[in-house]
Amino acid sequence: DLVDDVGRAYGFNDLEPRYPDIGTVGGRHDRSKLEDAVRTSLVGLGFEDLLDFHMISEAENYGRMGVEPGSDAVGGGDPVTITEPYSEDYTMLRTWALPSLVMVLENNTHRSYPQDVAEIGLAAAYDEAADTHVTEHRTVAAALARHDASYEDAKARLQALCADYDVDLETPATDHSSFIDGRAAEVVVDGESVGVVGELHPRVLVEHDLEVPVAAFEFRLDALA
């Protein structure tokens, strides 16, 4: 859009065409290739691929999920907020994608189950040490909403996904306020903690008017690179 505006102002007919001094070959970024591959794996595991907004409200990102802003929990990063938001529904960049998936489930309670949804998308948090004061990463999130959803279901699909990319997965027990005590684990890939897996806490389900159990996981995409 910017180049188009400059071209119109200068006059496209006044531009002198010339070949560039160097030759380049176009190609897709490795991250884009990885995203497509992981997306295909998720669909193969039975998930419906979603594309959601990267903007969210603080109430949805933290409050309704039971997460404390600024905490060390997955999704607890400090928010990157909008100074004058157009809508109170979109006041910040989301720090994790799971709240977006839970909102989709909330808006589809009138539909039949199971509902297994997943997304690969952007997450960001405020970081004073970063040059831009923002750190961004691509995240993989998935949720299983069904009458028999359990931690074991989510972990099994997580294991299958990681097996596709030949990475070493460990799931030590952890506490996370969005999940049931004793039914949550860290996602540790090749020795690094990159996410969480577990069953959503009943408080979160009630907050979103969900009447079936929901098991979910979320982790950093680059863990599979």
Spans of features found by a protein language model:
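Extended beta-strand-rich architecture
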Residues: 1-225
